[in-house]
């Protein structure tokens, strides 16, 4: 029974891996082609490209961590550190770019008369750049803290390159990484949550104005509000599941529960894979491109299956 569940879980992980690479690859490819043809990119397209690239990297790093048990006897402690730091880098930018996307939707769609809101809306691109540059400071602080802690605790493993030593070092890296990721993800998560509630407030005010004017609630502004809210809700839920899966995976690893670890791996891959698909469905340009690709593939398959006379 365990072997059957293990096989099913492996198939699901591979499917998420392929789907995540395809969906994020579509975002990168479509926007890069537009960049080549039009010679410019909007702020939204720039955020989407960087977010998709970071998620492709995160998917690969997550898969690499999943197979580390099979490679544990053939890799060094330094290589394990490289894997962990690459995972931290991808996860960091995936979170902050998604937060920047939520902020962009808030200021581009919401209608507020507050002076500070109007000022930030006017300087939206500058605000996004400052947010991402500020996040680099959090990333540097995170890496420095882990590096210092590792240097202090590494002496007990110095000169010991056995499998048990590497496993102990990997467990130590996992423990510190999860703790730091949880601490340093509080601020971007709160920013995304604040953007979500402010957008709800903006939608509520907009619907009130529509009712006072006896107009329908299917105008473009209402549709844009609901579309952005759907993207934000999916991001918040999927990222919460992602963090919880990392924590549960760490506990399962300490208790040597491989099945729970695999289930958590499936959950952690949902965030970079499924949310990118939701972004495609919520973006008219990307949605049309994906439909064109599907129609083209359907025609190719139909022509191949049609018998020739």
From Swiss-Prot:
One of its GO terms (cellular component) is membrane. Residues 29-46, 103-127, 204-227, 283-309 are cytoplasmic. It is a multi-pass membrane protein. GO terms for molecular function: bitter taste receptor activity; G protein-coupled receptor activity. Its main location: membrane. It is found in: Membrane. Putative taste receptor which may play a role in the perception of bitterness. Belongs to the G-protein coupled receptor T2R family. This is Taste receptor type 2 member 124. The lineage of its organism: Eukaryota, Metazoa, Chordata, Craniata, Vertebrata. The gene is Tas2r124.
């Amino acid at each position: 029974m365990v072997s059957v569940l293990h096989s099913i879980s492996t198939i699901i992980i591979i499917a998420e891996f392929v789907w995540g690479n395809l969906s994020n690859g579509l975002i990168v490819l479509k926007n890069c082609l537009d960049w080549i043809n039009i010679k410019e990119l909007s702020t939204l397209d720039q955020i989407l490209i960087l977010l998709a690239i970071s998620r492709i990297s995160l998917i690969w790093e997550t898969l690499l961590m999943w197979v580390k048990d099979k490679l544990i006897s053939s890799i060094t402690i330094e290589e394990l550190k490289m894997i962990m730091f690459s995972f931290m880098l991808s996860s960091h930018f995936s979170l902050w770019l998604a937060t920047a996307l939520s902020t962009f939707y808030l200021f581009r769609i919401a209608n507020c008369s507050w002076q500070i809101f109007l000022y930030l809306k006017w300087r939206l691109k500058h605000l996004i750049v400052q947010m991402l540059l500020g996040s680099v400071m959090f990333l540097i602080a995170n890496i420095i803290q882990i590096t210092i802690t590792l240097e202090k605790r590494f002496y007990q493993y110095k000169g010991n390159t056995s499998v048990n030593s590497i496993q102990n070092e990997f467990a130590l890296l996992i423990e510190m990484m999860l703790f730091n990721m949880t601490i340093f993800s509080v601020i971007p998560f709160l920013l995304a949550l604040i953007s979500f509630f402010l957008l709800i407030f903006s939608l509520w005010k907009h619907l009130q104005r529509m009712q006072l004017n006896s107009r329908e609630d299917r105008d473009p502004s209402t549709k844009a509000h609901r579309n952005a809210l759907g993207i934000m809700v999916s991001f918040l839920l999927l990222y919460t599941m992602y963090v919880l899966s990392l924590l549960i995976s760490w506990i399962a690893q300490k208790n040597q529960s491989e099945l729970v670890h695999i289930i958590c791996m499936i959950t952690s891959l949902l965030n970079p894979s499924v949310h990118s698909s939701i972004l495609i469905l919520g973006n008219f340009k990307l949605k049309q491109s994906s439909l064109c690709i599907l129609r083209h593939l359907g025609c190719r398959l139909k022509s191949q299956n049609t018998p020739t006379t």
